């Protein structure tokens, strides 16, 4: 299974990912951060069409190469950031629409292999030196991710769950979801 943790910056995805220990699963990287650090790819409000396609294609590659993976973010996230960039003229609408279509195609083709876990905004942003600290930007991204998650649920029949509450409550809910989906934790 591909367990995809999705949500805007600073919503607790990485915290939960780092607490999961599932035999046979690899921990995927947060692709945008990795590409930014290793290749200088522009992210957040500074992104552009080239950077978004690099990030998108890297996620597709990572999901295609790994049967069992826990991913910090997914295609719904990349498409949300791309929509923001299109509204700012930093990405073409044609490129955005093509990416959104490819997102739907990927999720439809892999619908039986994906568990989508959505993290809404519940916490104040913490400055880690990489994430954007702009609250309006985060709120925009959070809303667009939520729309994308709803769309893939309807279009592709993807199982999607929302995690809320304290870290302890989120882990209890995550354990329940994994048990429900037949994924055994250590």
Describe the predicted segments one by one.
Residues 32, 73-75, 117-123:
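Short loop/turn segments at strand-loop or loop-helix junctions that form parts
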Residues 85-168:
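A glycine- and Lys/Arg-enriched "phosphate-lid" helix/loop adjacent to the NTP-binding pocket
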Residues 13:
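Conserved lysine of the Walker
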